[in-house]
Amino acid sequence: MVEAHSRATGTCSSLPDVADAWSRVSVVTVTHHSGRVIGACARSVAAAARVIVIDNASDDDSCAIVAELLPDALLIRNPVNGGFGAGCNQGFERVATEFALLLGPDSTIDGAALALLVAAADAYPGAGMLGPALVAADGHIEPSHDLGLFARMGAGKRLDTGLPPEGPLSADHLSGAVLLVRMSALRQVGGFDPAIFLYYEDDDLCLRMRAGGWSLVLVPEARASHIGGGSSRMNLRYHWKKYWHYGWSRLHIEAKYRGRGRAVGIALGVLARYAGKALANALSLKPAKAVRDAARFTGSAAWLLGLPAMPDLPDLRKR
């Protein structure tokens, strides 16, 4: 395995044919109220041998758009939103190809970029996941790799804040917006943590990949587009949900890797901090900030009380 944040060794000079690259990949996409962006995503993967779309209880036109643009895709319509990671796991269970391309509904990729990712996967057989450089809607390069979660928290800032490296790089963490996943690695370490509804699920998978002996490789020559925010509705209800799960998942991941005692200590500090912030913002007539802080408080309290991130859900795996 290549050392983290070092230049990956090997070569990607043997670029496969684009059609060959698509034939080795199954695309997995999870949608939730994604009608605004899923059309561009679907068009970008029309050449794929297999596309698997898991819809998490959208009530917009997400499914209709997928059905129209990708009539041969496997479209699974979940009656309830079981979370991003659970949806991805449903898709992974149906992948029979060598690789899965995990593609957010607000992202697009072309055949040339995919071919570069597949070539890198062939060049670095120890890579469990590979990611491209991410290009935002305004054309700037987004951060797409970083230190591992706990090192990142200690550093206080992102590692990837400038231009991407010139060649492949082995990293501790890759963005989950677009990932080429080696299925043999995923089957070894397991898919996303089903306890996590939202946030930190990609950190958890990256940690387990590396613990399992697999490297994570950034392939900056491959570029994918990432609009961001494509599976959400920007209102106070969404704001609440977002920060509730942010609070819960942060403590779940802390307890999972560094012990419940440490997580409880963090939780108590969070409760004290965000109770005061929520009250102050409410009194200052700042509703969005008050909702944010109250949600963070409530999600953290729910974890501390042993409540799950979501109510009991039906088994979605075989739907």
Q: How would you name each of these model-derived features?
A:
Residues 78-95:
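Glycine-rich, basic loop-to-helix element that forms the pyrophosphate-binding segment
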Residues 100:
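Short aromatic/hydrophobic "clamp" motif used to bind/position activated sugar donors
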Residues 172-190, 195-223:
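A short, conserved alpha-helix in the catalytic core of glycosyltransferases
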Residues 149-172, 176:
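Short, flexible, basic/aromatic active-site loop/helix in glycosyltransferases
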Residues 111-143:
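Conserved donor NDP-sugar-binding/catalytic core segment of glycosyltransferases
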Residues 44, 55-64, 80:
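A conserved acidic beta->alpha catalytic loop
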Residues 29-47:
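Short, well-formed alpha-helical segments that are part of the catalytic scaffolds
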Residues 241-248, 260-319:
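Non-catalytic, C-terminal membrane-associated alpha-helical segments of glycosyltransferases
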